[in-house]
Swiss-Prot record:
Residue window of motif DEAH box: 331-334
Effect of gene knockout: Mice are viable and reach adulthood. However, both male and female mice are infertile; male mice have smaller testes, and female mice have smaller ovaries and show progressive loss of germ cells. Mutant germ cells enter meiosis but proceed prematurely to aberrant metaphase and apoptosis, and display defects in transitioning from spermatogonial to meiotic gene expression programs. Mutant testes reveal an up-regulation of N6-methyladenosine (m6A)-enriched transcripts.
Compositional bias of kind Polar residues: 1179-1189
Protein name per the record: 3'-5' RNA helicase YTHDC2
Each ANK repeat, start to end: 521-553, 554-586
An MF annotation (GO) of this entry: N6-methyladenosine-containing RNA reader activity
Gene source species: Mus musculus
Catalytic reaction list: ATP + H2O = ADP + phosphate + H(+)
InterPro entries according to UniProt: Ankyrin_rpt, Ankyrin_rpt-contain_sf, DEAD-box_helicase_OB_fold, DEAD/DEAH_box_helicase_dom, HA2_WH, Helicase-assoc_dom, Helicase_ATP-bd, Helicase_C-like
Tissue: Present in male and female germ cells (at protein level). Highly expressed in testis. Not detected in spermatogonia next to the tubule wall but is strongly expressed in spermatocytes, suggesting that it is up-regulated in germ cells upon entry into meiosis (at protein level).
Domain notes: The YTH domain mediates RNA-binding. It recognizes and binds N6-methyladenosine (m6A)-containing RNAs.
Length: 1445
């Protein structure tokens, strides 16, 4: 692309924004695109010399942006720009197209030169040949299956693509019938309500602002079909409006039936209980609630509170479900969650069908005009609140009045003078660099303009911002500083690449920070490497944890250095890495610099110093603690409500208050700390509403749930972090992220309104006035920022039969873009949830029932059929929620965190394994009471783990409700976990769920390729990015990582794209056979398999190579085409066998989907056995590891322990007093007072195991335990160093058996059979003194100790017993052998002999994976193996003794 001389060079703006009015950076069509990398033009293959800024008129920039955005989301494949454009304007379009992932080309000459932009076509990517070589054993396993059970004609035809649409009505009726029991509201008839009872709340009700408008509200609802009610939070609208309707119907003798929806489960239960109490009724009579998997309703219930999701599921059973309903109230409409918008779309349609139905929308901060337009001029009732005055304090006021400062703010003030000097030196560096590096461009560029431009930024952006976490500069010895400075200067000024070796050496051996700054210029090694174009060193630095957001004294980040000096490859690399970091756009310092004119000089300086000291992306817990202390010591009594974005921050702040901050921890009797989160149990929430005892202050840590759903009347002080966690989704890249973003103005006003309910209050806002002015008016509707696959499934169940999904969603209050809907529908077709006519398949109906995204739902259902459910439940819930590994800020810790993640993978080339084993090790640490220390040590989030447990419980509950997991017999929890220990099988379920997220290894070019990507890289957080973890990562890290892969296929959870580079994270290496059997559609075209001869005759070109040599070798290979991209070349016999195995699997899967509860047939069992044999054999032949212990059942949590289904519970010794829900119902405040939990309040685990406590819990994992089996046997190996809990240092006597410890299993060897007979008669045993201490300790530390007996040389186990006393000093004369120690009591459970061959398959990881029978006396068994060994006795016919050999 020839660049005309009129394009004047100018460095990019430091934040990556474009120059001129366009702005907007290099990315997704903001208002410009000035900063993107220039393409090298269609002709030139070389790198662009420099990324010069392209200056064109702002109108052209904006017009081009709009045109390209429309094109991106539209149907056209190609778009042409007029030939009247100048070459500069064309250059701008080329660059912007490239940054948007489009292909642009210019054709023609002179005045006829025009430019076309095309969308990338998947087929464009040439890829390496996809092959699959089967081992002899694999072929044998498939042959045996096919000989015994050939693929039947019925199976074959069922798996052919449909040619015509089936009878939709019949299928739909059958499937709706099948799934209607789950999570629906029951069908009652309207009745006249009973008279309300008088209660203690009557006077309070009458004082509510809404009470005055009772008659007006009832009258307007009677006269209109739709009514909007806007009332300030706490005005009483949620609890009173449904009661006004009940009372009116009672008075006039009119039957009614009312549904009232809430956005959250917690609110639905809380409001229902409150309303029942106000009417002096028990919950479940007139007033009830229903949430997913839990309900309290009866035939008398006339007012049901439910979640939006439950009402939607009810409507999915058909429109007639509302025929007996008189009123539907949709509360908190302003939250605009996807279900409420979706519900309104459906309800608007239903209002025409049900003339008597009334719809009431209630909200605190409604975008009223939108809804008036949507429902066609309906009346609006406004209810004023009666709050007292609330004073506002913004960030600058807080800093000024409280005098808050921190080390970094002080340091910043000192650094300012130094910084000016650094800028001057930096400018000299640039000019020196340009003298040596770019003589030809030197004539055009005046160096002065560089410094002038950056002087405009006052004192140069976030210069000292990232030195803050580094103690290094002040602690380093002078020779180190001198040495580092010299190295960085040499690299920059003399292109001395060898100096990097010394830099890496100093970072690792002398503890110099990887973000060390050159003392005279403030440049880091990453900036210097980026500006100089040293790509592999940039990669190395990033993998060592270098901060890509660090800024030099002129405000430039490494990315700006790379752009300015024309290093396009590094620009791509840094942008792709930055794009994949989970941050919203929160930087406030730039705002202060640009718009801070109305700030006083003092406030401006304060804010600038603060923003230099703290990263806006996070929540400043230090500042919150400072404020808390100030409030508690200088303000009157009154509850404090603190709004935080998520559970992580809530737990972090709670721990500071209760344990870490001495000012509070030493005075816990003065505070009650409560936590509110939507996934939390209601018991804590009920206590929040009660007034605390005198002299005790209530501190409530909450997410945005306390904005509207829950009103706490005694709140006087609100601390608002200004943040919320929001899921956002890029529909074009299919990437979902949980981002922390700024709240909307409407939310900020709501939060302020929570103070001053009982007297004047204060709202402390941890953001500036300027930030507040720049906030969005209302939150973006979830419908516009969420992945729509789940919603499209629900649409099919709600929309009329012949209405397309897109047509139905276009009726929403703010419809999502058509392209996003189309992409979602296409994805559902790809994963077999829908057919070509957009009708749901059998799989689709089940996926609509599961509370996770469809691809994860498919993964879980495949795991049920493959019988490896537990590991997949854990992995699926983790992927659905978030990565439990936290990213530390310091570079040295980043490396340690990476190493920890790597240890959890156990050499399996799988990030998914790291997630699974981290969860298992955390559960083990939790049962041993040291999970907090464990999480800190392994860089894990305690909060995330607790949420994952609750999600598992909910998902398992849904599988039970749908009939996939039975209570007992075939299909019970044990049966669906038969293969959980086999990692190859677990990965098959992962592959089935992850498809089409696959990449292929091109060994020849050492790159990864995808269906639409020519080049894919591992994200630095993936363990696969650093195969052999070395202290210094290899220079060509990605290539080394690719070469180390044992197979040619990878699955990934998420791909982030930026420019020409795609990053994949959460990957696992899988075998080609897994891809061939589990990927692609279930229904393959009849010509999917092309035999070699026909392959030649058809003349289909071989796209893998042009060389004749290769043509000859592929000529005798068959082709098996699974989809447009997956096209395998393999031996004809292998192709035919694999196609048949695929057909057997898919027909089995289809049968299970049609009848989940039906018993398995012989064919089904044989198919699964063959698949497992094939997967295991191929996994072994690829040299992939099979770690032990992955199938361990998680520890069941008793009902008080489930964090989501119940109150939060932690066995951590430091925390348990703060957040254990004690059996005596004491409040949190009282709990805080107790320094240690009383043992009496924890019933011993033994009784729990016997089912005496909580005998029935349908959602719990434990309803399937036999007397022997105990799922408490989890004792997980912790892969990170020192798995044992930190010891107290002093030997302590154990007071009583610890309740929450795992069960232990030991082998007892006897020299003769007579001793065993004595033991069985008298119930006693003795062992050698060397075993005594071990057994005694196990007896005291665990809930149960099982002893498995074997007489040496007998070839049998002779039974097992339970140890029922500790070992005493008294010895027995009965034993014939000398050298035995004291006697202890045992309780024999099974006395039958079990031949060793029954246990051949059991290997003990705690004895070098030897078979269990090869054990010495006193050998401990790994708990899961012990449990499996005991279960073998269940298979022996009862009472029938096997004789010993």
């Amino acid at each position: 692309m020839s660049r005309p001389s009129s394009v004047s060079p100018r460095p990019p703006a430091p934040s990556g924004g474009g120059t001129g009015g366009g702005g907007g950076g290099s990315g997704g069509g903001g208002g410009g695109g000035g900063g993107g990398p220039a393409s090298c033009g269609p002709g030139g293959g070389g790198r662009a010399k420099g990324l010069k800024d392209i200056r064109i008129d702002e109108e052209v920039k904006i017009a081009v942006n709009i045109a390209l955005e429309r094109f991106r989301y539209g149907d056209q494949r190609e778009m042409e720009f007029p030939s009247s454009l100048t070459s500069t304007e064309r250059a701008f379009i080329h660059r912007l197209s490239q940054s948007l992932g489009l292909v642009s080309k210019s054709k023609g000459k002179g005045a006829n030169r025009y430019l076309t932009v095309k969308k990338k076509d998947g087929s464009e990517t040439a890829h390496a040949m996809m092959t699959c070589n089967l081992t002899h054993n694999t072929k044998h396993a498939v042959r045996s299956l096919i000989q015994r059970f050939p693929v039947t004609n019925k199976e074959r035809t069922e798996l052919l693509p449909k040619t015509e649409r089936g009878n939709v009505f019949a299928v739909e009726a059958e499937n709706r019938e099948m799934s209607k029991t789950s999570g629906r509201l029951n069908n009652g008839i309207p009745q006249v309500p009973v008279k309300r009872g008088e209660s203690e709340f009557d006077s309070f009700r009458q004082s509510l602002p809404v009470f005055e408008k009772q008659e007006e509200i009832v009258k307007i609802i009677k006269e209109n079909k739709v009514v909007l009610i806007v009332g300030e939070t706490g005005s009483g609208k949620t609890t009173q409006i449904p009661q006004f309707l009940l009372d009116d119907c009672f008075k006039n003798g009119i039957p009614c039936r009312i549904f009232c929806t809430q956005p959250r489960r917690l609110a639905a239960i809380a409001v229902a209980e409150r309303v029942a109490a106000e009417r002096r009724e028990r919950i479940g009579q007139t007033i009830g609630y229903q949430i997913r998997l839990e309900s309290r309703v009866s035939p008398k219930t006339l007012l049901t509170f439910c979640t939006n999701g439950v009402l939607l599921r009810t409507l999915m059973a058909g429109d007639s479900t509302l025929s007996t309903v008189t009123h539907v109230i949709v509360d908190e409409v302003h939250e605009r969650d996807r279900f409420s918008d979706f519900l309104l779309t459906k309800l608007r349609d239903l209002l025409q069908k049900h003339p008597t139905l009334k719809l009431i929308l209630s909200s605190a901060a409604l975008d009223v005009n939108l809804f008036i337009r949507y429902f066609g001029s309906c009346p609006v009732i406004y209810i004023q609140g009666r709050p007292f005055e609330v004073k506002e304090m913004f960030l600058e006021d807080i800093l000024r009045t409280t005098g808050y400062t921190n080390k970094e703010m002080l340091k910043y003030k000192k650094e300012k003078q130094r910084e000016e000097k650094q800028q001057t030196t930096l400018t000299e560096w640039y000019s020196a660099q340009e003298n040596t590096f770019k003589p030809e461009s030197q004539r055009q560029r005046a160096v002065a303009s560089v410094s002038e431009e950056y002087d405009l930024l006052d004192d140069g952006g976030d210069a000292v911002f990232s030195q803050l976490t580094e103690k290094d500069v002040n602690c380093l010895e002078p020779w180190l500083i001198k040495e580092m400075d010299a190295c960085l200067s040499d690299i920059w000024l003399h292109k001395d690449v060898d100096a990097f070796a010394q830099v890496f050496h100093l970072i690792l051996t002398e503890n110099v920070s990887v973000d060390y700054r050159h003392s005279e210029t403030s440049a880091t090694a990453l900036m210097v490497a980026a500006g100089r174009g040293f790509t592999s060193q940039v990669e190395q630095l990033i993998s060592m944890g270098a901060n890509v957001h660090s800024k030099a004294s002129n405000g430039w980040m490494a990315l700006d250095w790379a752009k300015h000096f024309g290093q396009t490859e590094i620009v791509d690399l840094l942008e792709s890495y930055s794009a994949s970091l989970e941050f919203g756009n929160l930087d406030e310092s730039s705002l202060v610099q640009t718009n801070g004119n109305d700030l006083s000089a003092e406030d401006r300086e304060l804010l600038k110093a603060y923003h230099h000291s703290f990263d806006d992306e996070k929540v400043d817990l230090d500042l919150i603690m400072h404020l808390l202390y100030n409030i508690c010591h200088s303000c009157d009594a009154g509850a404090i409500l603190i709004f935080l974005p998520g559970y992580d921050e809530i737990v972090g702040l709670r721990d500071r208050i209760l344990f870490d901050d001495k000012r509070f921890a030493d005075n816990t009797h003065r505070y009650q700390v409560f936590m509110l989160h939507s996934n939390m149990q209601t018991s804590d929430q009920k206590k929040v509403l009660k007034n605390p005892p005198a002299g005790v202050r209530k501190i409530i840590l909450s997410t945005n749930i306390a904005e509207t759903s829950i009103t706490v009347n005694d709140v006087v002080f609100v601390i608002d972090s200004g943040k919320v966690k929001e899921k956002s989704f890029d529909a074009l890249n299919f990437v979902t992220m949980l981002k922390m973003v700024w709240i909307s103005k409407a939310s900020a006003i709501q939060r302020k309104g929570r103070a001053g309910r009982c007297r004047p209050g204060i709202c402390f806002r941890l953001f500036s006035r300027l930030r507040f002015q720049n906030m969005l008016e209302f939150q973006t509707p979830e419908l516009l920022r969420m992945p729509l696959q789940e919603l499209c499934l629900h649409t099919k169940l709600l929309a009329p039969v012949n209405c397309t999904i897109a047509d139905f969603l276009m009726k929403a209050p703010e419809p999502p873009p058509a392209l996003i809907v189309r992409n979602a529908v296409q994805m559902l077709k790809t994963i077999d949830a829908m057919d070509a006519w957009e009708d749901l398949t059998e799989l689709g109906y089940h996926l609509a029932d599961l509370p996770v995204e469809p691809h994860l739902g498919k993964m879980v259902l495949c795991a049920v059929v493959l019988k490896c459910l537990d590991p997949i439940l854990t992995i699926a819930c983790t992927l659905a929620y978030r990565d439990p590994f936290v990213l530390p800020t310091q570079a040295s810790q980043k490396r340690a965190a990476m190493l920890c993640r790597k240890r959890f993978t156990a050499g399996t080339f799988s990030d998914h394994m790291a997630l699974l084993r981290a969860f298992q090790a955390w559960q083990k640490a939790r049962s041993d009471g040291w999970e907090r220390a464990f999480c800190e040590k392994n860089f894990l989030s305690q909060a995330t783990m607790e949420i994952i447990i609750g999600m598992r419980t909910q998902l398992l509950g849904q599988l039970r409700a749908s009939g996939f997991v039975r209570a007992r017999g075939g299909g019970d929890i044990r049966d669906v976990n038969t293969n959980s220990e086999n990692w190859a099988v677990v990965k098959a379920a992962l592959v089935a769920g992850m498809y089409p997220n696959l990449v292929h290894v091109d060994r020849e070019n050492v790159i990864l390729t995808g269906p639409k990507e020519k080049k894919v890289r591992f994200h630095p957080t993936s363990v696969l990015s650093q195969p052999q973890y070395k202290k210094i990562p290899p220079a060509n890290g990605q290539a080394a990582a690719i070469q180390a892969l044992p197979t040619d296929w990878l699955i990934y959870d998420e791909m982030t794209r930026a420019h020409r580079i795609a990053n994949i994270r959460c990957c696992s290496a899988v075998t080609p056979v897994t891809v061939l059997v589990f990927c692609g559609p279930a229904r393959l075209a009849s010509n999917a398999l092309q035999e070699p001869s026909s392959f030649r005759a058809d003349g289909i070109p071989n796209d893998s190579s042009d060389s004749e040599m290769e043509d000859r070798t592929t000529a005798n290979l068959a082709a098996l085409k699974l989809d447009e991209w997956l096209n395998f070349k393999l031996e004809p016999e292998a192709a035919s066998l694999l196609l048949q195995l695929r057909q057997k699997w898919h027909s089995l899967f289809l049968r299970r989907m049609r009848a989940p509860s039906k018993p398995w047939s012989q064919v089904d069992e044989a198919t699964i056995r063959a698949i497992i044999a094939v997967l295991s054999t191929e996994e072994q032949s690829a040299g992939l590891q099979q770690p032990s212990g992955i199938g361990q059942r998680p520890r069941p949590m008793s009902s008080e322990e489930l964090p989501l289904a119940s109150s939060w519970r932690s066995n951590n010794s430091r925390k348990s007093t703060a957040d254990t829900e004690f059996a005596d119902g004491s409040t949190t405040g009282e709990r805080v007072l107790m320094k240690s939990p009383s043992p009496a309040l924890h019933p011993p685990q033994k009784y729990k195991d016997r089912g005496i406590l909580h005998p029935k819990r349908s959602t719990d994992d434990r309803s399937d335990q036999s007397s022997v089996k105990s799922t408490d046997s989890s004792s997980y190996p912790s892969p990170c160093a020192s798995p044992s809990p930190p010891s107290s240092g002093k030997g302590s006597k154990s007071p009583s058996p610890r309740p929450n410890m795992p069960i232990r299993y030991f082998i007892m060897k006897s020299s003769n059979l007579r001793n065993l007979e004595i033991s069985q008669q008298k119930g006693i045993w003795s062992t050698t003194p060397s075993n005594e201490r071990k057994l005694n300790r196990a007896f005291w530390e665990s809930s149960m100790v099982y002893l498995v007996f074997s007489v040496q040389g007998s070839g049998h186990f002779q039974g097992f017993s339970r140890m029922s006393s500790e070992i005493g000093r008294e010895k027995s004369q009965d034993w014939g052998s000398a050298g035995l120690g004291g006697v202890f009591k045992v309780e024999w459970i099974r006395k039958e002999s079990l031949p060793f061959q029954f246990a051949h398959h059991l290997l003990n990881p705690w004895n070098d994976n030897k078979k269990v029978q090869i054990s010495r006396d006193g050998q401990e068994l790994e708990p899961q193996v012990g449990e499996q060994l005991l279960q073998l006795w269940e298979r022996l016919p009862l009472g029938e003794k096997t004789t010993s050999d």
